Regions:
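Active-site neighborhoods and metal-handling regions in enzymes and metal-associated proteins
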Residues: 1-227
Length: 227
C-alpha cells in the first residue's frame, strides 16, 4: 500500500469526513485510480479552492519565503564578483545553483536563467555556452526553495563598458520596477501593478519591447495566484 493511504484513512475515520479534496491539475490518472480504490472516501477536485487559499500567506509562510530570498541574495552577492569576460552562461548558472544549495536551499525554484548579450532579449532563455563579453548585459533569473517555499528574483548586471543607450534602458527598467512596487498594496490587482510599471516603459518609448508581464506571486509553487 502507498505509505500515505493508511494515514489518510485513519484521519478520515477519526474526523468522520467523507470527501477529500485533491489538486486534479497535478495528479496523474494512475494515482487517481490508485487512491480511488484505496481511500475510504470520495475524491473531489479542489484545485481552484486550494489556489484561492494559497493567495494569502500567514507569518510563518512569509518568513520562509524571506529566508529563501535571503539565500538567493547571498548567491547574487557572490556571483557578481565572478561574472567577467570569458565565463559562459552555463558556468554562471551552475555556480548560482551551487551557491544557493551551499547557502541552505533545499532545491532550485526552477532552472536558473542566464542570458547575456543578444540572448537577453529572450525572457525565458536557456543558458548556453556563449562566453560573456565586455560590454554585455547579463540577465539572471533564479530562486530557491527553503522549507517548501520559493523565492524568485531577476537581476541584470553590466560587464565592463556599456553604451549610453544601455544605461538609459537599464534605468527605465529600474524606474518601472519601483513604480510597480509602489503600486503593490492591499486592494490592488495584478493588472494595476503591471499597468503602473508598463506605463513607465511605454512613456520612455520602449513599450513595443516589453514582451512579458511585470511579475507574479510565489509560494509553495513558483507561480501562484494572484497574478
Amino acid at each position: 500500500a502507498h505509505p500515505y493511504v493508511d494515514l489518510i484513512n485513519a484521519a478520515m475515520e477519526k474526523t468522520h469526513v467523507q470527501k477529500l479534496g485533491f489538486e486534479d491539475a497535478y495528479m496523474t490518472v494512475a494515482d487517481y485510480r490508485h487512491y480511488s480504490e484505496k481511500l475510504h472516501c470520495q475524491l473531489v477536485p479542489a484545485t481552484e479552492l486550494l489556489i484561492s487559499l494559497r493567495q494569502s500567506k500567514d507569518e510563518e509562510e512569509i518568513q520562509r519565503m524571506i529566508a529563501a530570498q535571503r539565500i538567493a541574495e547571498g548567491a547574487l552577492d557572490q556571483i557578481v564578483k565572478e561574472i567577467k569576460p570569458g565565463v559562459t552562461e552555463k558556468e554562471i548558472a551552475a555556480r548560482l545553483q551551487y551557491l544557493m544549495l551551499a547557502g541552505g536551499a533545499e532545491n532550485m525554484s526552477f532552472d536558473p536563467i542566464v542570458a547575456s548579450g543578444p540572448n537577453g532579449s529572450m525572457p525565458h532563455a536557456v543558458p548556453t555556452d556563449r562566453k560573456i563579453q565586455d560590454g554585455d548585459f547579463v540577465t539572471m533569473d533564479f530562486g530557491c526553495i527553503y522549507q517548501g517555499y520559493c523565492s524568485d528574483m531577476t537581476r541584470t548586471v553590466a560587464v565592463g563598458h556599456v553604451t549610453e543607450e544601455m544605461e538609459k534602458v537599464y534605468n527605465v527598467v529600474l524606474q518601472a520596477q519601483l513604480a510597480g512596487i509602489a503600486a503593490a498594496k492591499a486592494g490592488a490587482t495584478g493588472h494595476d501593478v503591471d499597468a503602473a510599471a508598463r506605463k513607465v516603459i511605454e512613456d520612455a518609448g520602449y513599450g513595443p519591447y516589453f514582451g512579458h508581464s511585470f511579475g507574479h506571486s510565489v509560494g509553495v509553487e513558483i507561480h501562484e495566484s494572484p497574478n
